[in-house]
């Protein structure tokens, strides 16, 4: 294909492109618009940006600038009549006025119209055709366009030709700051969602994950409110032999992506799902895996997915060979790779299951080390721990976090929730009861002692052995003992896992009496956190929390 033919194909003035030109008042002579450009073209443009290179394995290495993680304190929801009575207002969803929205939207448009290249990505969120939404992303960095091309569900040529008007539009002008003096602003970054306009704007942060998580919040609103479909911060996979579905709940860094990428099971998705009356479907068309300390030995499927078409974010590489040093966290602990889900050999395409979950896994990364590697949960304990959403905030997943911090994140996804946590928890309880799902709490964090006191991270091979025993049914038939205070049921034996690892009260490095003090401290944090929910929780759920003698 000749250069002129290629340019005509990629940057031609389609109806969509013409609409964007008119909306942004773009010059035909100055600005090139690329709609759903292929990876090779986005590589070509991306490599013109400072520091962007190709890794030795073929991935595009890009950098997000100052912000290398999400900025949850800068998230805003526009307070407007159609959604204000549904939104869970507070620290998670801070309101901004429609006037502030208009100012910032125009500021984003002003910036975009100064660019010589604008990228449009038209794609879908949600694999179930009954519930999917059409998403349009408008941005000025090729890296952002490739990222969202990977993370959304890519349309066929026919679907793209008949795409029509989007259901939701993202305007990403992240290279340009918000005006700190504008009402409702707390910094020069803002991520604003307007459910009336069905649009999102991004200013003051180039971290690509803001686009992905913004769409997630949109689905946390649209699916329950308009379709009675439960949106979940979870990964999901399905047994090849019998089709059993497992959901993994957990915050960033707890192991959702790693544990759901299992060569013995089909991957439905690694992060964002919906549970409808028909089964489970993935929201995304790609995976956004953490890369810190990545190795081919520990995580071969993720390692092998880092190839042409993938985006590596904020990694360090050898300048001569372009081999990435995945152990180097000098830019951030939150190094990431975004790749299409079909780069995982065991991915199930389309990414949905017409059966309901058999096993529910609540993942926590406990930096205190007092929770066991695995415990079986009663239905009431599931609700208590789902609403609590305890984990340790892992280094790098947010700005300023450099070592694990204990935190509670309701529904294991509090930064992304649009509605009150009790609404999601009630929907989950109903679905688990209807479909008789089993539930387990798995700690992928520290064991033997706390992070501070020299405890060790639970080896991945043991966590995988625990999951194998859940999936083959053997764990359900083991003998259990009760862990004090939390009253968790802990197995005395798990195939492939050292018995001394299973009960933290017995393997605590400072002795069992010191363990009791540590577990009491964590239990007090649980009780304190749950006070904000106790007026709406049932007595059975309250009784499923820590009990002090």
Swiss-Prot record:
<keyword id="KW-0547">Nucleotide-binding</keyword>
<dbReference type="InterPro" id="IPR008210">
    <property type="entry name" value="PEP_carboxykinase_N"/>
</dbReference>
<comment type="subunit">
    <text>Homotetramer.</text>
</comment>
<dbReference type="InterPro" id="IPR001272">
    <property type="entry name" value="PEP_carboxykinase_ATP"/>
</dbReference>
<dbReference type="GO" id="GO:0005524">
    <property type="term" value="F:ATP binding"/>
</dbReference>
<dbReference type="InterPro" id="IPR013035">
    <property type="entry name" value="PEP_carboxykinase_C"/>
</dbReference>
<feature type="binding site">
    <location>
        <begin position="250"/>
        <end position="257"/>
    </location>
    <ligand>
        <name>ATP</name>
    </ligand>
</feature>
<comment type="pathway">
    <text>Carbohydrate biosynthesis; gluconeogenesis.</text>
</comment>
<keyword id="KW-0067">ATP-binding</keyword>
<keyword id="KW-0210">Decarboxylase</keyword>
<keyword id="KW-0456">Lyase</keyword>
<dbReference type="GO" id="GO:0004612">
    <property type="term" value="F:phosphoenolpyruvate carboxykinase (ATP) activity"/>
</dbReference>
<keyword id="KW-0312">Gluconeogenesis</keyword>
<dbReference type="Pfam" id="PF01293">
    <property type="entry name" value="PEPCK_ATP"/>
</dbReference>
<dbReference type="GO" id="GO:0006094">
    <property type="term" value="P:gluconeogenesis"/>
</dbReference>
<protein>
    <recommendedName>
        <fullName>Phosphoenolpyruvate carboxykinase (ATP)</fullName>
        <ecNumber>4.1.1.49</ecNumber>
    </recommendedName>
</protein>
<dbReference type="InterPro" id="IPR015994">
    <property type="entry name" value="PEPCK_ATP_CS"/>
</dbReference>
<comment type="similarity">
    <text>Belongs to the phosphoenolpyruvate carboxykinase (ATP) family.</text>
</comment>
<dbReference type="GO" id="GO:0005829">
    <property type="term" value="C:cytosol"/>
</dbReference>
């Amino acid at each position: 294909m000749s250069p002129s033919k290629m340019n005509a194909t990629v940057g031609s003035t389609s109806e969509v492109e013409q609409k964007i030109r008119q909306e942004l008042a773009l010059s035909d002579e100055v600005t090139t618009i690329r709609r759903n450009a292929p990876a090779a073209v986005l590589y070509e443009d991306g490599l013109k940006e400072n520091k962007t290179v190709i890794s030795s394995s073929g991935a595009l290495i890009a950098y997000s600038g100052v912000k290398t993680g999400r900025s949850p304190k800068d998230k805003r929801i526009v307070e407007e009549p159609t959604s204000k009575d549904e939104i869970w207002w507070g620290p998670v969803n801070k309101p901004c006025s429609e006037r502030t929205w208009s100012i910032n939207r125009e500021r984003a448009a002003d910036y975009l119209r100064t660019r010589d290249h604008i990228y449009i990505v038209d794609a879908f969120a949600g694999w179930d055709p009954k519930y999917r939404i059409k998403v349009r992303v408008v941005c000025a960095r090729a890296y952002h366009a490739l990222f969202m091309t990977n993370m959304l569900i890519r349309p066929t040529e026919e679907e793209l030709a008949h795409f029509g008007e989007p259901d939701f539009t993202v305007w990403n002008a992240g290279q340009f700051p918000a005006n700190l003096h504008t009402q409702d602003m707390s910094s020069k970054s803002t991520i604003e969602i307007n459910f009336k306009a069905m649009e999102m704007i991004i200013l003051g942060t180039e971290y690509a994950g803001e686009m992905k998580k913004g769409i997630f919040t949109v689905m946390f609103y649209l699916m329950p409110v308009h379709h009675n479909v439960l949106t979940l911060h979870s990964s999901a996979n399905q047994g090849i032999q019998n089709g059993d579905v497992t959901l993994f709940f957990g915050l960033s860094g707890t192991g959702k992506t790693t544990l759901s990428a299992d060569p013995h099971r089909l991957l439905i998705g690694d992060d964002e799902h919906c549970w409808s009356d028909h089964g489970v479907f993935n929201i995304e068309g790609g995976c956004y895996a953490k890369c810190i300390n990545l190795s081919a030995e520990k995580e071969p499927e993720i390692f092998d997915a880092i190839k042409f078409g993938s985006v590596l974010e904020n990694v360090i590489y050898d300048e001569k060979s372009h081999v990435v040093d995945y152990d180097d966290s000098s830019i951030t602990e939150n190094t990431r790779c975004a790749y299409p889900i079909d780069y995982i050999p065991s991915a199930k395409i389309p990414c949905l299951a017409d059966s309901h979950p058999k096993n529910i896994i609540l993942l926590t990364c406990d930096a205190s080390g007092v929770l066991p590697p695995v415990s079986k949960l009663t239905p009431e304990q599931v609700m208590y721990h789902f609403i609590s959403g305890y984990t340790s905030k892992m280094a790098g997943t947010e700005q300023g976090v450099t070592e694990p911090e204990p935190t509670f994140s309701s529904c294991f996804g509090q930064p992304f929730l649009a509605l009150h946590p009790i609404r999601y928890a009630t929907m989950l309880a109903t679905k688990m009861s209807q479909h008789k799902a089993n539930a387990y709490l798995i700690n992928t964090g520290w064991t033997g002692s706390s992070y501070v006191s020299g405890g060790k991270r639970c080896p991945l091979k043991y966590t995988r052995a625990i999951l194998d025993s859940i999936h083959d049914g053997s764990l359900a038939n083991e003998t259990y003992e009760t862990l004090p205070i939390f009253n968790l049921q802990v197995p005395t034996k798990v195939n492939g896992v050292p018995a001394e690892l299973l009960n933290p009260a017995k393997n605590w490095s400072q002795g069992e009496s010191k363990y009791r003090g540590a577990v009491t401290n964590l239990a007090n944090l649980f009780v304190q956190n749950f006070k904000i929910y106790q007026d709406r929780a049932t007595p059975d759920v309250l009784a499923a929390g820590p009990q002090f003698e």
